Swiss-Prot record:
It is an enzyme of class 6 (ligase). Keywords: Aminoacyl-tRNA synthetase, ATP-binding, Cytoplasm, Ligase, Nucleotide-binding, Protein biosynthesis. L-glutamine binds at D67, Y212. It is found in: Cytoplasm. This is Glutamine--tRNA ligase. It comes from Vibrio campbellii (strain ATCC BAA-1116). One of its GO terms (molecular function) is ATP binding. A motif ('KMSKS' region) lies at residues 268-272. The lineage of its organism: Bacteria, Pseudomonadati, Pseudomonadota, Gammaproteobacteria, Vibrionales. Monomer.
Amino acid sequence: MSEADARPSNFIRQIIDKDLADGKHTSVHTRFPPEPNGYLHIGHAKSICLNFGIAQDYQGQCNLRFDDTNPEKEDIEYVESIKKDVNWLGFEWDGEVCYSSNYFDKLYEYAIELINKGLAYVDELSPEQIREYRGTLTAPGKPSPYRDRPIEENLALFEKMRAGEFEEGKACLRAKIDMGSSFMVMRDPVIYRVRFATHHQTGDKWCIYPMYDFTHCISDALEGITHSICTLEFMDNRRLYDWVLDNITIDCRPHQYEFSRLNLEYTVMSKRKLNQLVTEKLVDGWDDPRMPTVSGLRRRGFTSASIREFCKRIGVTKQENMIEFGSLESCIRDDLNENAPRAMAVLDPVKIVIENFEEGAVETLTVANHPNKPEMGEREVPFTREVWIEREDFREEANKKYKRLVLGKEVRLRGAYVIKAERIEKDAEGNITTIFCTYDAETLGKNPADGRKVKGVIHWVSADKALPAEIRLYDRLFTVPNPAAADDFAATINPESLVILNGFVEPSLAASEAEKGYQFERMGYFCADSKDSSADNLVFNRTVGLRDTWAKIENQ
């Protein structure tokens, strides 16, 4: 299979193939243009993979450009976070990071050009009046009384706007297009407004700032973008995109293409709703492992490869649809099953005492880090007289389907010996506190000599040598597939989206690298928390379970 055949295929790539074949373009230049007013989420990751992936596959270029035209809501913190996320996802932008603010002087000149052509005017209607005059989807707008000002007057007023002689909301520059258009975006849109705000890149140089729709298309053209790719909600805006470029003097003529945004079950993507979750402390910040932000997914233990694979699997279309959350979980589960080293951890411990094992003795066992990858090596696991096992791995009585430890019967401890439960000890409430066992010293790495069958295998850790750890069991943040459709989306938060347990982990995990995935055998995939875990206070986050338990619930 050739490299071209191995590429993903979608309608955008088909357009690019045709453009190159027809000679419309000789190379491909895309961009990823976030506004630095928040943290990236997995919906942005889809756009990142699309734009940077196209540039990679066509040996082209992809810019990282910050659409920074709204200084009141933007911050350098978001700039740095976005750069980190793009790099973490596995991509490098071409050249220096771009900012729309780099082009403020040129944008101002293009606004002057539109005024000189009679295609823009200074409007002194209030923002409320502008909305009223714009009309509705069923009623045309009506022209502003300032629409037909002479060009010279508009130039003078626009210069006064720049000089700070108008208060905010008292004047704006509008494109002069068509107040009767069936497309609201074409009814004389505002292209400049007054804002007395310090900008994180330009400081206090400007007190007028261009609007997104005016800025975006010109920035694309100035950077030589060939294919400007955005989501479907900007489809109507393409008319304004084209109008601006058709009416200014500029060499490059990019074209805008739209694809469907990512809608993922059991979460929300709206910046407003995500912000509500954070400000109302319904989650623990933007990087809470339950959040769909790139930083939250990273902290939970998702790998960049798994997110790229997810974006590849869901594809690029114009059809709006809801993607199953299980599809995302499947990608990280496949990745970690293949690449994560194994370790043992007991989340809900009950003690076992092996009565015929020497008291105080420590036997060092050697266990493979991965059952199918010998190249991942081995680790040492201490075995002692007292060990912890999962409480759910023992029953006083059980049927034949129960393949774990039962009173009077045997089970194998993973990587160690066969043990037999002889008797138990309970507290005053009837809870089992200790299981007394014996072990078969001849069963390390082999079956019992007399041929008896021992089918069950359970995990364990040494009670003497294991390390205490806080285990955070993360799950889906909402109880319904589409929380955004609920009257009160916050009321659908899953009360069990975070369950905290105090367990024990094997000592090899003492120096666990933050966010590195492990399979805790039989329990799921986990990683050390990047903010709270330390050598003295181990904290592990569950990334995903070994299997999709929600699928069973949804199918009931």
